[in-house]
Amino acid sequence: MEFNELMNAFAAKCGLAGVEAEDGCVVLEFNDIPVAFMENDAFESLVLRAVIGAPPPETDGSLAKAMLRANHALCNACGATLCQDPETKEYAAVLTIPLSIADADLLAKAVGNIVKTVNTWQGVVASGTADQSADSRLYV
C-alpha cells in the first residue's frame, strides 16, 4: 500500500478526515502523545516516531542502560526501538513497518504499542533513574 493511501485508510479508521503528508510526514496525536508517521522510500517502509522526553541533567547513565536492556529482543518496548536523538538529546520510541504488509489495522496496533511504550518510559525518564529493581515495571 502506498504511504498516502495507507495514511488516509488509517485516518478513516480513526474517524478523521483525510490527512495530507508534508514532506513525507504526517503527525497525529493519541492520548496527548504526538506520533510522527514518516515514509522511508529507501527501505519502502513506514517509520513511526514518538518522543519520550529529555533525560534529567543529573542522569547517572542508568536510563540509557535500561533502554539498552529494553531493546534486547524488543521485550520491553512493544516492538519499538528506544533511542536518543543526537541533536535534541530527547529519548524516543521508533517503530518501522514495511509498506508491503502495512494496512490500517496493523497501523492501529502499532500506534497502540508505541503509545503504550512512550507512556511507560515517560514515567521512567521522569524519575531520572531505572535500576535493576525497576525492570519489572518496564515490561509493557
Positions of PLM-derived features:
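Hydrophobic residues embedded in beta-strands of well-ordered beta-sheets
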Residues: 26, 44-46, 89-91
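A short acidic-to-branched-hydrophobic micro-motif
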Residues: 37-39, 44-54
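Short, internal acidic amphipathic alpha-helical interface segments
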Residues: 51-90, 94-96, 139
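Ampiphathic alpha-helical segments that act as solvent-exposed interaction surfaces
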Residues: 66-67, 71, 97-129
